[in-house]
C-alpha cells in the first residue's frame, strides 16, 4: 500500500478542539514535524479535517 508524508505547516493554536486532537492523533507535535502513514481512508479523512494546517506528499 502507498505511504504518505504529512507535515504540520501551521499551528493548531486557536483552532477548534477537534482539529487540535486530529493533529495529535496524526502524530504531529511541533511545527514542521513530519510523519509517514499508510494511505487509507481513515488517514485521508483526518487529513481532510486539518488540510489547512498540513501539507501532504506521496512517499515512494
UniProtKB/Swiss-Prot annotation:
Alphabetically ordered keywords of this record: Ribonucleoprotein, Ribosomal protein
InterPro entries (alphabetical): Ribo_uL30_ferredoxin-like_sf (IPR036919), Ribosomal_uL30_bac-type (IPR005996), Ribosomal_uL30_CS (IPR018038), Ribosomal_uL30_ferredoxin-like (IPR016082)
Gene Ontology molecular function, alphabetical: structural constituent of ribosome
GO biological process: translation
Pfam families membership: Ribosomal_L30
Cellular component annotations (GO), alphabetically ordered: cytosolic large ribosomal subunit
NCBIfam families (alphabetical): rpmD_bact
Subunit and interaction comment: Part of the 50S ribosomal subunit.
Family: Belongs to the universal ribosomal protein uL30 family.
PANTHER family: LARGE RIBOSOMAL SUBUNIT PROTEIN UL30M, MITOCHONDRIAL RIBOSOMAL PROTEIN L30
Protein name: Large ribosomal subunit protein uL30
Taxonomic placement: Bacteria, Bacillati, Bacillota, Bacilli, Lactobacillales
